[in-house]
Amino acid sequence: MSTTSSKVAIKPLEDRIVVQPLDAEQTTASGLVIPDTAKEKPQEGVVLAVGPGRFENGERLPLDVKTGDVVLYSKYGGTEVKYNGEEYLVLSARDVLAIVEK
């Protein structure tokens, strides 16, 4: 079972995970710089911490993701959190769409 282990002092509960979004491309192919206000929200990030899983029928269900995985997640899923000057995303495991294979 994957349990919480993190590089960050945020410990997610139940089936939640803490993700650090990867920076989206900052310039276009032709070299134009895209301002922050026009950027798409990233949908890819690195898992920094994993909760212990949720209970169902008295048993804890393990999560499919683990710390260090690069995941694709729902565009509008999760809650943005700023902690110690860093921005993180706290997602429910159901908001994770896929794990990116290395």
Swiss-Prot record:
Subcellular location: Cytoplasm
SUPFAM superfamilies attached to this UniProt entry: GroES-like (SSF50129)
Gene3D superfamilies for the chain: GroES chaperonin
BP terms from Gene Ontology: chaperone cofactor-dependent protein refolding
GO molecular function, one term: protein-folding chaperone binding
Superkingdom of source: Bacteria
Gene Ontology cellular component terms for the protein in this record: cytoplasm
UniProt keyword annotations, A-Z: Chaperone, Cytoplasm
Record's function text: Together with the chaperonin GroEL, plays an essential role in assisting protein folding. The GroEL-GroES system forms a nano-cage that allows encapsulation of the non-native substrate proteins and provides a physical environment optimized to promote and accelerate protein folding. GroES binds to the apical surface of the GroEL ring, thereby capping the opening of the GroEL channel.
Subunit relationships: Heptamer of 7 subunits arranged in a ring. Interacts with the chaperonin GroEL.
Family: Belongs to the GroES chaperonin family.
NCBIfam families xref list: PRK00364.1-6 (NF001530), PRK00364.2-2 (NF001531), PRK00364.2-4 (NF001533), PRK00364.2-5 (NF001534)
UniProt-recorded name of the protein: Co-chaperonin GroES
Organism: Streptomyces griseus subsp. griseus (strain JCM 4626 / CBS 651.72 / NBRC 13350 / KCC S-0626 / ISP 5235)
